[in-house]
């Protein structure tokens, strides 16, 4: 069940409520202090969009391998663990992070999406969510790393996540001009 306090009452609450949740998760899972991430959190609070173009279902972390195809049609999607109600710009930030811009120019893809769907993507919100999705990805990887460090899960992949998370940290530093 989705906690009631996470359901946006209107378009002004989308980003703020999700940020409050991820701030809590970040402080619960970080195995050690990360001053750059603390700075990123301050940046996210300061730049948090005041309005979303509407409340939409946000899938989150949509990689190109998560579609289930039947012929030329997508008939299902997998990996819904980051789904929530929010700003559709977040899904485009995840897509950009996953490399969709290598297939076609991101601006052209978003223009096409806006024309077909009628849903507008605010460029300022997209820029914000490009940092926020990196913050989320870093936090998720730290959660796995923490389980490894604590001895709760000894899969080598989880130990390696700590190294991978630093690539997200570098991107955050670059995007926030730290």
Question: What are these regions, as identified by a protein language model?
Answer:
Residues 160-178:
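Regulatory N- and C-terminal appendages and interdomain linkers associated
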Residues 89-120, 132-152, 168-171:
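Active-site activation/catalytic loop segments of kinase-like enzymes and analogous catalytic loops
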Residues 35-93:
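Active-site acidic catalytic loop and adjacent metal/ATP-binding pocket
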Residues 65-67, 124-127:
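Conserved beta-strand->loop/alpha-helix structural units within folded catalytic cores of enzymes
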Residues 1-42, 48-56, 84-85, 152-165:
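A cross-family kinase active-site recognition segment
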């Amino acid at each position: 069940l989705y906690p009631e306090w996470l359901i946006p009452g209107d378009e002004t609450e989308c980003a703020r409520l999700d940020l409050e949740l991820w701030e809590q998760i970040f402080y619960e899972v970080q195995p050690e202090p990360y001053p750059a991430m603390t700075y990123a959190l301050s940046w996210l609070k300061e730049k948090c969009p005041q309005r979303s173009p509407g409340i939409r279902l946000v899938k989150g972390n949509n990689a190109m391998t998560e579609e289930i195809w039947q012929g030329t049609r997508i008939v299902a999607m997998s990996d819904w663990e980051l789904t929530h109600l929010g700003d559709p710009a977040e899904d485009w930030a995840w897509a950009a992070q996953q490399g969709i811009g290598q297939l076609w120019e991101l601006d052209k893809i978003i223009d096409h999406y806006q024309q077909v769907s009628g849903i507008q993507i605010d460029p300022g919100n997209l820029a914000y969510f490009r940092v926020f999705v990196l913050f989320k990805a870093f936090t998720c990887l730290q959660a796995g790393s923490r389980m490894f460090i604590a001895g709760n899960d000894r899969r080598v992949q989880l130990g390696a996540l700590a190294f991978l998370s630093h690539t997200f940290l570098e991107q955050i530093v670059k995007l926030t001009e730290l």
